[in-house]
Design a protein with these regions (language model features):
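C-terminal ends and interior cores of transmembrane alpha-helices
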Residues: 87-100
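Transmembrane alpha-helix termini and helix-breaking/packing motifs in multi-pass membrane transporters
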Residues: 38-43, 151-170
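Helix-breaking motifs and short loop linkers at transmembrane-helix boundaries and internal kinks
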Residues: 45, 77, 99-100
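Juxtamembrane intracellular "pre-TM" segments in multi-pass secondary transporters
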Residues: 5-16, 188-222
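MFS-fold secondary transporters
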Residues: 33, 42, 93-96, 112, ...
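Helix-loop junctions on the cytosolic side of multi-pass membrane transporters
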Residues: 125, 129, 168, 172-197
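Helix-loop boundary and gating motifs at the non-cytosolic
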Residues: 9-61, 218-222
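Substrate-agnostic recognition of the 12-TM MFS/MFS-like secondary transporter fold
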Residues: 18-34, 58-71, 79-89, 104-160, ...
Length: 222
């Protein structure tokens, strides 16, 4: 007999495999990219401040835009929010390979940080479509993330012995692989939102995020 439950289970397993594999390749590439940028800037400027600035450029995205990116994910949809940022990250890295410019590094670092933030929000939004056990699945994602961080560091340490340019080329490839895996996810998925949230306009949502951000900064600094 035809069993719809088996089909759902197979779909969940496939989505889990694609999402976890994409996370691994994306995080591995991001780690190697960050180390590559740090190496490039230090070798070019020999300045600790300039070297640290590339990390600041990446983290700045989360601090300034983090509260608003959830709105973008909701408006654009999960597939757009996961696949497009990975493709963009891959291509802008390849641009840097052909255009060797110090200031371009900071722009690319900011853009990749922006893309990774959107991807992270969309990934978390997709999890309820795979499993109801969010605690275990989030623990699995964290384990994969840590393994990818180690793998990215090892990847960088091996490839840097041959060429820094090759680091960025291979990193770009990992982003494209991640985009392909995310593209293979079930596309018939929409972000589940509460009715009170869905009834809000974009302007109201942005205003709420700004108020929340201001309140958070007051708690931190006042």
């Amino acid at each position: 007999f035809y069993n719809l439950g088996d089909d759902n289970m197979n779909l969940e397993n496939k989505n889990s495999f694609f999402l976890n594999s994409a996370l691994f390749f994306s995080t591995m590439g991001s780690t190697a990219t960050t180390l590559g940028f740090i190496t490039y800037i230090f070798n070019t400027t020999h300045s600790p401040f300039n070297t640290g600035a590339v990390t600041i450029a990446t983290l700045l995205v989360g601090m300034l835009l983090g509260p608003f990116l959830g709105i973008l994910v909701k408006e654009k949809g999960l597939m757009w929010s996961m696949v497009v940022p990975e493709i963009v990250s891959g291509f802008i890295l390849l641009i840097f390979v052909f255009i060797d410019n110090l200031y371009l590094v900071y722009i690319i670092a900011f853009l990749i940080g922006f893309n990774n933030k959107i991807l992270g929000i969309a990934r978390l939004s997709f999890i309820p479509n795979i499993t109801n056990d969010l605690v275990k699945f989030n623990a699995l994602l964290r384990s994969i993330n840590r393994f990818a961080l180690i793998s990215g560091s090892l990847l960088f340490s091996v490839i840097i012995n041959y060429s820094l340019t090759m680091v960025f080329v291979i990193d770009a490839i990992t982003y494209i692989i991640s985009a392909y895996l995310l593209y293979r996810l079930n596309r018939n998925v929409k972000i589940q939102s509460h009715s009170t949230i869905s009834q809000k306009t974009i302007r109201q949502s942005i205003y709420d995020r700004i108020q929340l951000l201001i309140k958070g900064y007051k708690l931190l600094f006042l």
